[in-house]
């Protein structure tokens, strides 16, 4: 049951400012969510500007239907399919692409979605509920090794192997089909307690990341965004945990360094390897005031780069 689906957009003004909006520009909001960033971008555009937003969550698509604006198009796709979404929208050479990655407050707060251990609900966890395997279905078939790797790699949980063994043993007695069942198994297994954090937190994060292939989606989306940008266009990415931020940091760093010099020398000046991105400023984090107003913003990090 949904208890609270209010969503407070994180780093709203900072993200839109980082895009360096041109009034007649073309922009992509690769993670529409509930449209906080999109609405703010639209407010900066004139009648010649255009915004294409992307989201794989059907509830986000439904929320986007409220925006009646000829400058705006919302595409139902995962952001890992950014190139396909751009083709569908008929855009190229855009002025900015924004990512606000990870799970949203409405997804967490809707107990029926199965993202949170705070509600006892079907163990689903799919961001796109129209396709793919649920978390319960995966746990029913996965081997101990696979469960261990997912929880260790995506949850950074040191009791991953013990949790995996517990899950496999428990499913022989009865199927694990609810968030309450999975959370109870994890709590029984994790022998240490971190202040202010439920023992199930890391395992729920890991399972969600795996079911939605969140890190892989980000890895394939960033090169597509770079290809889509025109020179001078901005790439802005907000992430919420170290696994995501590492991918963004490494991508931007690697693309800001020229490729190795070819062995076939001499070369003309136009043949010399050139970097593809310029890093813009330092990573930005929410202010103390924003974190106080919205505690879920505390782990956010925003990185900015400009295409050369």
From Swiss-Prot:
Location relative to the cell: Cytoplasm
GO biological process, one term: rRNA base methylation
Positions contributing to S-adenosyl-L-methionine binding: 35-37, 55, 79, 100, 107
Keyword set, alphabetical order: Cytoplasm, Methyltransferase, rRNA processing, S-adenosyl-L-methionine, Transferase
Listed name of the protein: Ribosomal RNA small subunit methyltransferase H
One Gene Ontology term of the molecular function aspect: rRNA (cytosine-N4-)-methyltransferase activity
Role this protein plays: Specifically methylates the N4 position of cytidine in position 1402 (C1402) of 16S rRNA.
Family according to the record: Belongs to the methyltransferase superfamily. RsmH family.
Gene: rsmH
Gene3D superfamilies associated with the record: Putative methyltransferase TM0872, insert domain, Vaccinia Virus protein VP39
Protein species of origin: Dechloromonas aromatica (strain RCB)
UniProt EC number: 2.1.1.199
Lineage top rank: taxon: Bacteria
Principal place of residence: cytoplasm
Family matches, as HAMAP family: 16SrRNA_methyltr_H
Catalyzed chemical reaction(s): cytidine(1402) in 16S rRNA + S-adenosyl-L-methionine = N(4)-methylcytidine(1402) in 16S rRNA + S-adenosyl-L-homocysteine + H(+)
Gene Ontology CC terms: cytoplasm
InterPro entries: RsmH, SAM-dep_MeTrfase_MraW_recog, SAM-dependent_MTases_sf
């Amino acid at each position: 049951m949904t208890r609270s689906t209010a969503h407070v957009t994180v780093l709203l003004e900072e993200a839109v400012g980082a895009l360096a909006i041109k009034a007649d520009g073309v922009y992509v909001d690769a993670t529409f969510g509930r449209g906080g960033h999109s609405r703010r971008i639209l407010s900066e555009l004139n009648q010649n500007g255009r915004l294409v937003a992307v989201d794989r969550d059907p509830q986000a698509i439904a929320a986007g239907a409220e925006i009646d604006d000829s400058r705006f198009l919302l595409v139902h796709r995962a952001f890992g399919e950014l190139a396909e979404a751009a083709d569908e929208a008929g855009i190229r050479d855009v002025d900015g692409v924004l990512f606000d990655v990870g799970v949203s407050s409405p997804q967490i707060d809707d107990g029926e979605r199965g993202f949170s251990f705070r509600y006892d609900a079907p163990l689903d966890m799919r961001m796109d509920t129209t396709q793919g395997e649920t978390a319960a279905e995966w746990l029913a078939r996965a081997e101990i090794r696979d469960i261990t790797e997912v929880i260790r790699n995506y949850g950074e949980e040191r009791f991953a192997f013990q949790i995996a063994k517990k899950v496999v043993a428990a499913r022989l007695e009865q199927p694990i089909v609810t968030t309450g069942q999975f959370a109870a198994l994890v709590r029984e297994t994790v022998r240490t307690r971190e202040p202010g954090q439920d023992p199930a937190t890391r395992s729920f994060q890991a399972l969600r990341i795996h079911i939605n292939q969140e890190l892989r989606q980000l890895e394939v989306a960033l090169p597509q965004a770079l290809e889509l940008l025109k020179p001078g266009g901005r790439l802005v990415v907000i992430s919420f945990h170290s696994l995501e931020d590492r991918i963004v940091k490494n991508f931007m760093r690697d693309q800001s360094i020229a490729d190795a010099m070819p062995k076939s020398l001499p070369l003309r000046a136009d043949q010399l390897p050139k970097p593809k991105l310029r890093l813009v400023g330092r990573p930005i984090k929410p202010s103390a005031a924003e974190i106080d107003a919205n505690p879920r913003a505390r782990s956010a990090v925003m990185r900015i780069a400009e295409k050369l």
